[in-house]
């Protein structure tokens, strides 16, 4: 009874909530969608549920680990930013050593699941993505270079590739398109955040593009990267990995996102509101494409099966 009371106490609930928060559940959820999209794109309707579950759980734990370790690394700059000043690693509600141990334990568990159930290539991408995010981006590039976003975009693009390679076990054109597509998406998404959180980044002396080189250059880069993202996204249907439904969705969302980005050049634009709109629609875009590439891939598989069966009957 005492044990049950202890677990129900406000202190324990607050501590549990703190451990959940350092894993950044919103980021985990977004990555779950992209992992599933990559997996189902490669599976084309022939889904191994055990493999899919292992890919989702394993990669989610790896992402959670990276986020927790990032909280430990960033605690000094988080203290200077209004948005992050209440994090438990800043307030001291949970000891940094405990958060680090928790994060590393999640990583070991996540990588172990991927190693046991997926394949060497999927595991390799997960490891490289983790090293880039924690070791290269968080420890150095974020604090010291305007190119930090470009480096970080690679790790952000890894989850759908892990999902895809879990099925195929090879780095083919589909995996390459996904890697490039999601890397390109990360950049305008991140620059939009940096614009509407400009004061936070400036206070922490983080050299993101809007802070280091100004709004004009940041707006130009947002427009250019969205335009290239739209072209690269169209490669999936053009290369035969998805069908007309994905092409329709990618054209509609990408062009709308691009039109929204171009509004940043209006003389009467509210730059903060505009950046939030660009950021918000970036989430809608990548979610829509992740879901559509999974569903459209299955439709193509069914069409192929149907045509094969008909051919057999006629023969």
UniProtKB/Swiss-Prot annotation:
Ranges annotated as spanning the membrane:
25-45, 49-69, 87-107, 120-139, 145-165, 176-196, 220-240, 242-262, 280-300
InterPro entries registered for this protein in UniProt: Protohaem_IX_farnesylTrfase, UbiA_prenyltransferase, UbiA_prenylTrfase_CS, UbiA_sf
The protein's annotated catalytic reaction(s) are: heme b + (2E,6E)-farnesyl diphosphate + H2O = Fe(II)-heme o + diphosphate
Q: Where in the cell is it found?
A: Cell inner membrane
Q: Which Gene Ontology cellular component terms are annotated?
A: plasma membrane
Its annotated function is as follows: Converts heme B (protoheme IX) to heme O by substitution of the vinyl group on carbon 2 of heme B porphyrin ring with a hydroxyethyl farnesyl side group.
Q: Which family does it belong to?
A: Belongs to the UbiA prenyltransferase family. Protoheme IX farnesyltransferase subfamily.
Name of the protein: Protoheme IX farnesyltransferase 2
Q: Which gene encodes it?
A: cyoE2
């Amino acid at each position: 009874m005492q044990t049950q009371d202890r677990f129900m106490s406000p202190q324990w609930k607050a501590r549990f909530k703190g451990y959940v928060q350092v894993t950044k559940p919103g980021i985990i959820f977004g990555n779950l969608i992209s992992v599933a999209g990559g997996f189902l794109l490669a599976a084309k309707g022939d889904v191994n549920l055990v493999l899919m579950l292992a890919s989702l759980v394993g990669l989610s734990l790896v992402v959670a680990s990276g986020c927790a370790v990032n909280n430990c690394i960033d605690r000094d700059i988080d203290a200077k930013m209004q948005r992050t000043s209440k994090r438990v690693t800043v307030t001291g509600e949970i000891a940094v050593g405990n958060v680090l141990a928790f994060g590393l334990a999640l990583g070991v568990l996540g990588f172990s699941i991927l190693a046991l159930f997926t394949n060497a290539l999927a595991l390799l991408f997960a490891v490289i993505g983790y090293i880039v995010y924690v070791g290269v981006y968080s420890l150095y590039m974020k604090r010291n270079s305007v190119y930090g976003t470009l480096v970080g975009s690679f790790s952000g693009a890894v989850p759908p590739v892990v999902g895809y390679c879990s099925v195929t076990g090879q780095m083919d054109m589909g995996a390459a398109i996904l890697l490039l597509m999601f890397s390109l998406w990360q950049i305008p998404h991140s620059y939009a955040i940096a614009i509407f959180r400009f004061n936070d980044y400036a206070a922490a002396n983080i050299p993101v593009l809007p802070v280091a080189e100004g709004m004009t250059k940041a707006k130009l880069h947002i427009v250019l990267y969205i335009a290239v993202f739209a072209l690269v996204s169209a490669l999936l249907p053009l290369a035969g990995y998805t069908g007309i439904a994905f092409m329709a969705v990618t054209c509609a969302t990408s062009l709308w996102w691009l039109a929204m980005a171009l509004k940043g050049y209006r003389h009467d634009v509210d730059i903060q509101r505009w950046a939030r709109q660009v950021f918000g629609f970036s989430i809608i875009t990548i979610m829509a494409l992740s879901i559509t590439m999974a569903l459209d891939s299955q439709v193509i598989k069914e069409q192929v099966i149907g045509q094969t069966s008909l051919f057999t009957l006629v023969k």
